């Protein structure tokens, strides 16, 4: 069979004999070269591409020939001499892979092989790793270690059973009951109690004294602070009273001055001077109050003076009237 006219179709199989390796058609049950029968070991062939044929070659107008083949995976058209695809490297004739299902995909769980694993009590597991319970122990044969441990445990049990009981004093309570009590001073306990009471009383007294002294010092400090605050308040009150008295004296002196000024300006009949003095007095509220007082006093003085001035005029008039009447009577007598 020439290689030029060799075409592989799906289902063709390769002879299982390594020396032969002939590719047989799918319809054959035995090898065409060596006559060996077809078995399950025979690998099936798979065509990675198909020839395009004459019709497609004519449509390409001389670009491709009828023997060129088209890849099944990527669809690229390759020359006839190529054994692999130029794009995806898929072989033109390949062996059919076995569908075991171990790698996933088609027929994934059909024929699954379960590995039977035996759990052993050995030092190492199935992967050759040392188990955790044996990691900290010294390296050695397991049988020897077990024998040594068994011997040690048996020896300890025998020692516990045959041990002397003399070290355990079982009659110790009875001996204590029958022992002499002469070595114990029973009266010493009472003396110790009295001494303890005295010491406690002394301590309580010293504590009470210290507390009393602390309280007295605190009270003295409080009283001193209070006296200081009182003296401070008194001094502040005295300073306040002084300031008040000085302000009163100052106001009185100002009032007397205003009164004297008002008296000096009484004789003048011009209203301008009075308005001038009133404008000066209105500069402050205190001056206005004092001026009002001085005005009231000046008005009272004016009334008194007017009444006084009128009274001598009346006297004069009365005296003149009396003199006229006397002269009239004297003239009548004449």
Curated annotation (Swiss-Prot):
Region (Disordered): 117-334
Any single GO BP term: RNA processing
Sequence ranges of Basic residues compositional bias: 196-212, 302-318
Keyword tags: Metal-binding, Nucleus, Phosphoprotein, Repeat, RNA-binding, Zinc, Zinc-finger
InterPro entries for the chain: Znf_RanBP2, Znf_RanBP2_sf, ZRANB2
Location(s) in or outside the cell: Nucleus
Coiled-coil regions, chain positions: none
GO cellular component term, pick one: nucleus
GO molecular function: lipopolysaccharide binding; RNA binding; zinc ion binding
A Pfam match: Zn_ribbon_RanBP
Chain intervals with Low complexity compositional bias: 213-224, 258-285, 319-334
Family matches, as SUPFAM superfamilies: Ran binding protein zinc finger-like
Zinc finger annotations (RanBP2-type) as residue ranges: 9-40, 65-94
Annotated Acidic residues bias: 150-163
PANTHER family xrefs: ZINC FINGER RAN-BINDING DOMAIN-CONTAINING PROTEIN 2 (PTHR12999:SF17), ZINC FINGER RAN-BINDING DOMAIN-CONTAINING PROTEIN 2 ZRANB2-RELATED (PTHR12999)
Function, as annotated: May regulate alternative splicing by interfering with constitutive 5'-splice site selection.
Domain remark in the UniProt entry: The RanBP2-type zinc fingers mediate binding to RNA.
Family per similarity comment: Belongs to the ZRANB2 family.
Protein name (Swiss-Prot/TrEMBL): Zinc finger Ran-binding domain-containing protein 2
